[in-house]
Amino acid sequence: MIAVASGGLFLVAWILSPKHGRLAHLIRRFRLRLQIATDDLLAVIYRREESGRLLMNHGENIVISSSLLSWLTKKRAVSKGWLDSSVLDSESRLQLTPKGREMAQSIVRGHRLWESFLHRDFQLAQDHLHEPAEIAEHFLGPDLQRELSERLDTPGTDPHGQSIP
């Protein structure tokens, strides 16, 4: 009986521990996933605006499909003041606010700086630059971006010829 009670207490602690429990781990992973999805949404809208297109194409709509994560992503972006809430129901017409454009610009800047860094310092081919930059862009804050920019002598364009904001 004591072994069963001890096992039960261990199981409860293993699941509910605020720092190392499974539930806390799942919550942290979901928050990170939501942050990355929000960053991706802002970057897609920024790139669309940068190219002068008003509507998203089918490939871009995949990023903001009708899943729960997508809905939470848009809600989070609106609550942070990054997306214009008046067009929230129209996925093809999502618009950044000035604050959202600044955030998206930072994400795209990090992406393009990382591509430039990989191309220059590791001599990676252009077709091998996008995926690592797609991951790194979510973790490159202003300090790292500034350091990368200085290290790269403030490049104006990335290896693909896109301007670095």
Language model features: what each stretch is:
Residues 1-47, 138, 142-165:
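Membrane-interfacial segments at transmembrane helix termini in multi-pass membrane proteins
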Residues 51-165:
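Structured cytosolic domains appended to multi-pass membrane proteins
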